[in-house]
A protein has these predicted regions:
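A detector of single, family-specific signature residues
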Residues: 1-377
Length: 377
């Protein structure tokens, strides 16, 4: 048995260094939508082979299997997904998907081609300098696609609502009678639909888009809620729901984005979510900057939004909504969630006493969330 995938953020040396000598051929693949370039090193003879393919993954798999074995291949994670990874594993070729942000590149290298990129990946693989990403299962990947479709719809809805508001603002309408985008707000908007034909046509176009986006969002919400209640992700969603600010939709999204929480510690989860401060230190100088923002942006946004709920006063007795979520979780998770809610609120109190800006305090709160309030079995 060679490389065993499944954990993220660690060099493949931590998985298969004892079996490194078992592999004879190291393959680097530069994968694009329509072309794939391969570079292979025979570690026994030192021979380097190169090949260019179209978009047919079967050709890549056949070429890789024709090389002296055993073989191990790598390519960068990206928009092409993990189909090639799965095909290679099925054919008997070990494969690791590299984290693009962790690839080492010479600062003086100003020539980038597909062939050079494939050779670079091959070389890093042979030198054991690849940082692997966690490859989700097919079920996890499809659930993640569902969640991200909902996120795309949310952004579309927010954008078209802004466009409709700006259209009305340019014609002198400002709504200041309560919360926006309620039934009352909708009735008020339609009362200001009048005007010339061009304005009414523009209004109707944006209004129809709003209605369609709301319907699409609600349809996705129902699908996510149903999946959260009866799927392999249900236990994790129920445990996450013990925290304030983690609804069913948020809990399901976090469950499918992070998948295996136990691969992280309290310190590494912050780095994965890019909630740790950037640093520029040298010698006696130490300078900290804003958060790195290099990790999973989807999970980070969810946690930052959920952290705002801990700013409110903490009550030992949960609300009816939170109690309903607690009833679905194990007792250990309930106790862990209660302790986490209290600790996160006390963090907010401490930040307020130090006169920290709310936006800064809110980002600092989820950075240590996993350490004291992560899901419990």
């Amino acid at each position: 048995v060679g490389y065993q995938p499944g954990r993220a953020g660690l060099s493949i040396a931590e998985f298969w260094r004892p079996q490194l000598s078992d592999y004879r051929t190291f393959v680097g693949l530069d994968v694009h939508a329509r072309t794939i370039v391969g570079s292979a090193l025979d570690a026994t003879t030192g021979e380097v082979l190169r090949h260019r393919f179209g978009c047919d993954l079967s050709e890549v798999v056949a070429w890789t299997r024709s090389l002296p074995g055993p073989q191990i291949a790598t390519y960068e994670a990206g928009p092409t997904g993990f189909g090639l990874y799965r095909r290679l594993l099925e054919s008997g070729t070990a494969c690791v998907v590299a984290a693009p942000s962790k690839l080492q590149r010479p600062s003086g290298d100003r020539v980038r081609t597909d062939a050079r990129d494939a050779f670079h990946l091959m070389r890093l693989l042979h030198l054991d300098e690849i940082t692997a990403v966690t490859v989700p299962s097919v079920e996890e990947e499809t659930a993640r696609d569902l969640v991200r479709s909902r996120e795309d719809t949310r952004q579309d809805l927010m954008g078209v609502r802004h466009r409709l508001s700006r259209l009305l603002l340019r014609h002198g309408f400002v709504y200041d009678d309560g919360a926006a985008w309620t039934q009352k707000h909708d009735r008020c908007l339609r009362e200001h639909r009048g005007g010339d034909l061009a304005f009414m046509t523009a209004f109707d176009a944006n209004d129809e888009t709003v209605v369609q986006a709301v319907a699409r969002r609600d349809r996705l919400d129902k699908a996510i809620t149903a999946m959260a209640e009866d799927s392999p992700f249900t236990p994790m969603v129920n445990r996450l729901g013990c925290l304030r600010g983690i609804s069913t939709l948020t809990g399901f999204a976090l469950a499918v984005e992070i998948t295996d929480w136990h691969r992280f510690t309290g310190s590494t989860i912050g780095a994965y979510l890019a909630l740790v401060p950037s640093e520029y230190s040298s010698g006696q100088s130490r300078q900290l900057g804003g958060i790195t923002k290099t990790g999973n942006t989807h999970a980070r946004r969810l946690l930052v939004e959920a952290a705002w709920h801990h700013r409110r006063d903490y009550r030992p007795s949960p609300s009816s909504v939170l109690q309903a979520r607690w009833d679905k979780a194990p007792v250990a998770a309930q106790l862990r969630g209660q302790a986490g809610n209290e600790r996160l609120h006390h963090q907010w109190v401490a930040f307020t006493a130090r006169k920290k800006r709310p936006v800064v305090a809110n980002v600092a709160s989820p950075a240590s969330w996993r350490a004291g309030a992560g899901p419990s079995r």
